UniProtKB/Swiss-Prot annotation:
<comment type="function">
    <text>Catalyzes the formation of 6,7-dimethyl-8-ribityllumazine by condensation of 5-amino-6-(D-ribitylamino)uracil with 3,4-dihydroxy-2-butanone 4-phosphate. This is the penultimate step in the biosynthesis of riboflavin.</text>
</comment>
<feature type="binding site">
    <location>
        <position position="113"/>
    </location>
    <ligand>
        <name>5-amino-6-(D-ribitylamino)uracil</name>
    </ligand>
</feature>
<protein>
    <recommendedName>
        <fullName>6,7-dimethyl-8-ribityllumazine synthase</fullName>
        <ecNumber>2.5.1.78</ecNumber>
    </recommendedName>
</protein>
<feature type="binding site">
    <location>
        <begin position="56"/>
        <end position="58"/>
    </location>
    <ligand>
        <name>5-amino-6-(D-ribitylamino)uracil</name>
    </ligand>
</feature>
<keyword id="KW-0808">Transferase</keyword>
<feature type="binding site">
    <location>
        <position position="127"/>
    </location>
    <ligand>
        <name>(2S)-2-hydroxy-3-oxobutyl phosphate</name>
    </ligand>
</feature>
<comment type="pathway">
    <text>Cofactor biosynthesis; riboflavin biosynthesis; riboflavin from 2-hydroxy-3-oxobutyl phosphate and 5-amino-6-(D-ribitylamino)uracil: step 1/2.</text>
</comment>
<feature type="active site" description="Proton donor">
    <location>
        <position position="88"/>
    </location>
</feature>
<feature type="binding site">
    <location>
        <position position="22"/>
    </location>
    <ligand>
        <name>5-amino-6-(D-ribitylamino)uracil</name>
    </ligand>
</feature>
<comment type="similarity">
    <text>Belongs to the DMRL synthase family.</text>
</comment>
<dbReference type="GO" id="GO:0009349">
    <property type="term" value="C:riboflavin synthase complex"/>
</dbReference>
<dbReference type="GO" id="GO:0005829">
    <property type="term" value="C:cytosol"/>
</dbReference>
<dbReference type="GO" id="GO:0000906">
    <property type="term" value="F:6,7-dimethyl-8-ribityllumazine synthase activity"/>
</dbReference>
<dbReference type="InterPro" id="IPR036467">
    <property type="entry name" value="LS/RS_sf"/>
</dbReference>
<dbReference type="Pfam" id="PF00885">
    <property type="entry name" value="DMRL_synthase"/>
</dbReference>
<feature type="binding site">
    <location>
        <begin position="85"/>
        <end position="86"/>
    </location>
    <ligand>
        <name>(2S)-2-hydroxy-3-oxobutyl phosphate</name>
    </ligand>
</feature>
<dbReference type="InterPro" id="IPR034964">
    <property type="entry name" value="LS"/>
</dbReference>
Length: 156
């Protein structure tokens, strides 16, 4: 039996990060955590491109364009959708998650879901660097692992 898994080595990987500007008090912290995770695992800052979009709903389109370019080993999507008093939360959350998954499957490039979908601002703050760690950092590690796993599969 052969076993395959990705490593967390970021050397020579080219990564894109798509960040929503909406709820920037959260997404800025997710981006900081993500960049910290990448730098701690030897990703050269010259190999990281950051793209800003207005809101989470716009993330899948930009991720698709980047994935189609075949320039990146992985793409990290960062955003924060926080429930309000209207059904808007459900629409945006559902479409963003479906859109990101579809891009990854269609383009065969890992697109990591680092979009927080929280009921409250406090939950989002907790996941952006306080009690629950930083989900941006976690997304960075997922991107490294998946990028390396995809390389291993291609080489086997």
């Amino acid at each position: 039996m052969r076993t395959f898994e990705g490593s967390f080595c970021g050397k020579d990987l080219k990564l894109a990060i798509v960040v929503s500007r909406f709820n920037s008090f959260i997404t800025d912290e997710l981006l900081k955590g993500c960049l910290d995770g990448l730098s701690r695992h030897d990703v050269d800052s010259e190999n990281i491109d950051v793209y800003y979009v207005p809101g989470a709903f716009e993330i899948p389109l930009v991720a698709k364009k980047l994935a189609k370019s075949k320039k990146y080993n992985a793409i990290i999507a960062l955003g924060a959708v926080i429930r309000g008093s209207t059904p808007h939360f459900e629409y945006v959350s559902a479409e963003v998650s479906k859109g990101i998954a579809n891009v990854s499957l269609e383009q065969e490039v890992p697109v990591i879901f680092g979009v927080l979908t929280c009921d409250t601002v406090d939950q989002a703050i907790e996941r952006a660097g306080t009690k629950a760690g930083n989900k941006g950092f976690d997304a960075a590690l997922s991107a490294l692992e998946m990028a390396n796993l995809m390389k291993n599969i291609s080489e086997s």
